[in-house]
UniProtKB/Swiss-Prot annotation:
Catalyzes a reversible aldol reaction between acetaldehyde and D-glyceraldehyde 3-phosphate to generate 2-deoxy-D-ribose 5-phosphate. It comes from Shewanella pealeana (strain ATCC 700345 / ANG-SQ1). NCBIfam families: deoC (TIGR00126). InterPro entries: Aldolase_TIM, DeoC, DeoC/FbaB/LacD_aldolase, DeoC_typeII. It is an enzyme of class 4 (lyase). The keyword Lyase applies. This is Deoxyribose-phosphate aldolase. The active site is at residues 102, 166, 198.
Length: 257
């Protein structure tokens, strides 16, 4: 198997197969659950809006997809600085049955010089997850832009108890970049290599996936990237990976996240 095919195979096992669109329906989520059981093995998770968690759980149970985690989003997509609302949304997501919660860090507050609210919001949402769900923190690196801010958001999130740090919501102009990945995984290597990393949005093909995995290997070791420490947030990526593995049709034009 070529290196590119190996990267494609690995990326599928690390994927949070995502639909976070305003026009999502029960049927779209059911279809997503079926897609997550790919000819190359299951994706790590699906990522959906909280209201679809019950139908996703029912569907995964029906198709022997119990190993596929259900991730959802809170404080999404704007990363507001109201801690109480973020906590209520996170508690509700866990009550719905989410295995994983991707919460948006209040990145605009950080850009305005407020480091405290981000730390406190992540800490409170981590407490809301309890032992029932892991917490991924979306720092919106493409809007932060400044390497010092990307580093600070990563440090604050990890210090507050994040299980993963994630680049992007997929709802802004600049999503996952190798530059942000380098900064974020450097912070992980310095602070706690058990914390995971999730590039999201903009990872479109096996070549791009391989580049992100390469950064992980260089900074954290060849065996570091597993579903416990690395995820790709993506929707259109899966089609390309299956095509690379000669298990699916060629991708049809540009598709979102």
């Amino acid at each position: 198997m070529s290196d590119l095919k190996k990267a494609a195979q690995q990326a599928i096992s690390l994927m949070d197969l995502t639909t976070l669109n305003d026009d999502d329906t029960d049927q779209k989520v059911i279809d997503l659950c079926h897609k997550a059981k790919t000819p190359a093995g299951d994706t790590a998770a699906i990522c959906i809006y909280p209201r679809f968690i019950p139908i996703a759980r029912k569907t995964l149970n029906e198709i022997d997809g119990d190993d596929i985690k259900i991730a959802t989003v809170t404080n999404f997509p704007h990363g507001n600085d109201d801690i109480a609302i973020a906590v209520l949304e996170t508690r509700a997501a866990v009550a719905y049955g989410a295995d994983e919660v991707d919460v948006v860090f209040p990145y605009r507050a950080l850009m305005a010089g407020n480091e405290t609210v981000g730390f406190e919001l992540v800490k409170a949402c981590k407490e809301a997850c309890g032992e029932d769900a892991i917490l991924k923190v979306i720092i919106e690196s493409g809007v932060l832009a400044d390497p010092a801010l990307i580093r600070k958001a990563s440090e604050l999130s990890i210090d507050a108890g994040a299980d993963f740090i994630k680049t992007s919501t997929g709802k802004v102009a600049v999503n996952a970049t190798l530059e942000a990945a380098e900064i974020m995984m450097t912070v992980i290597s310095e602070k706690n290599p058990k914390v995971g990393f999730k590039p999201a949005g903009g990872v479109k093909d096996a070549e791009a996936a391989a580049e992100f995995l390469g950064v992980a290997a260089r900074l954290l070791g060849d065996d570091w990237a597993t579903p416990a420490t690395f995820r790709f947030g993506a929707s259109s990526l899966l089609t390309n990976l299956l095509h690379t593995l000669e298990l699916g049709d060629a991708p049809q034009g540009a598709q979102g996240y």
